[in-house]
Amino acid sequence: MARYPSVDTRRLFGYLAGYPFSPETLRQLKEQKVDLLHSHCPVMSTILARSIRDVVDAPLVFTYHTKFDVDVAKLLRGRLLQESALYVLASNISACDEVWVVSHGAGENLRSIGYQGDYQVMENGVDMPRGRVSEEAITAATTDYDLPEGVPVFLFVGRMMWYKGLRIILDALKLLQAGGQDFRMVFIGSGADAAEVQKYAKPLGSKCIFTGAISQRETLRAWYCRADLFLFPSSYDTNGLVVREAAACDLAAVLIDGSCAAEGVTDGVDGFLIDENAGSMAAKLQKICKRPECMAQVGCQAGDRLYLSWGDAVKRARERYGIVMENYRMGRYDDHHRPMDGVLNAQGSIMDALAKLRDLGDGLAERYREGWDEHREGIQERRDEFREEFQERLEEHREGRRAFRTELKQKGEALWQKLDRYL
């Protein structure tokens, strides 16, 4: 593994952005035996991979799993800027040898930003094992919260961002509350909109619970097992891993019909589908709450039909990697973007050369500092030796003066004694 430095862009994007022209990273990667390059970022990581692709002689795979047109629209003002940014993204993705998407909807979104090539649908798996945790584990995780028996528990897990469909959830629950249906709604996660979401949920009172982020996977599993329904009305997500995490615990999800998260879900069989509005969700929840046995049955079907383990997903990826490397060896990939790869590689080489010059300069400066330090130490030693010699001679001179005064005094006293005898 070769790590490379990053730039703090959390205020803009919520995460760090890598710096693709790190000389040290380029040197490390060029020295390693690389069979295949796989990027999950259409900008920095892909630029880094392209800059070394010809040097390491390996194919480049890219996975698209975020609706970047939504992010670009939020970050950039002005249609021209947005279109230019999306063009750069699509061009960079098109330069990869093979493109993977995490859902058919993600592929359609990729097409909408200007990508015209082929792609492979490679679904993500989840690291949660299939099956429920013990009742003791559920009690330990949820005991501090007001969850009365017999009252439906709805669950959301994810970032506290409005684009996750949180307003639809809260508005639907307000309609449900107005209709006299009791419930508990549990939100697990954190995010930039958390404070606004909690304020918007105030009219629901104690029926709405915010736990904050939970990083312990077993605790999260316990919450999935305690809930009766998983609410995820997001049209932003391209795959919805949390839907499959819920399915791992036999928990059915309420999803937007036609969304990426709802791919492969059949209404009333292994999940519940609604239109993208609060009224549709409220009507669906009102109907489901009257049939609690239906929630459990559909949840089991979700586990059987939707669950995909991380191990199975990795196995599929490894099998596809073999096909990619074979296609690369046989020259089946288009190389019309290779000249630009050369430019990127040249940029990396320039950065590497500059780094070497900097290192050389640092080395010369270090040797100069060492020589100056030795010279300064020599001067200090000679100064100390002179001081010691001067002190010794000064002390000898003082001793001589004291001895002379003593001798002179003795001779004077002897002379006065002789004079006293004659006088």
Describe each model-derived feature in a short phrase.
Residues 59-61, 69-91:
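Nucleotide-sugar donor phosphate/pyrophosphate-binding loop at the beta->alpha transition
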Residues 93, 213, 222-227:
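Short alpha-helical donor nucleotide-sugar binding micro-motif in glycosyltransferases
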Residues 100, 147-174:
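Conserved donor-binding/catalytic core segment of Leloir-type glycosyltransferases
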Residues 105, 125:
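Carbohydrate-associated surface elements
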Residues 195-214:
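Nucleotide-activated donor-binding/catalytic signature segment of Leloir-type glycosyltransferases, i.e.
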Residues 235:
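Aromatic "clamp/platform" in nucleotide-sugar-dependent glycosyltransferases that forms part
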Residues 252-256:
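Short hydrophobic beta-strand element within catalytic cores of glycosyltransferases
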Residues 267-268, 272-278, 287-292:
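Conserved acidic donor-binding segment of nucleotide-sugar-dependent glycosyltransferases
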